[in-house]
């Protein structure tokens, strides 16, 4: 899923949902678990 893409650095530069660094794999999990969190 998204973790794999992040691991490859494809979605790393753009993590607007979490606002975390490129090493954060929470891009997908955060988005699914709490999409309205605003992080």
From Swiss-Prot:
Record-listed E.C. numbers: 3.2.1.21
Sequence segments annotated as region (Disordered): 1-39
Activity-pH dependence: Optimum pH is 5.5.
KW Hydrolase (keyword) present: yes
GO molecular function: beta-glucosidase activity
Keywords noted in UniProt: Carbohydrate metabolism, Cellulose degradation, Glycosidase, Hydrolase, Polysaccharide degradation
Domain of life from the UniProt record: Eukaryota
One Gene Ontology biological process: cellulose catabolic process
Swiss-Prot/TrEMBL catalytic activity: Hydrolysis of terminal, non-reducing beta-D-glucosyl residues with release of beta-D-glucose
Keyword Hydrolase: yes
Thermoactivity: Optimum temperature is 45 degrees Celsius.
Record's protein name: Beta-glucosidase 2
Species: Passalora fulva (Tomato leaf mold)
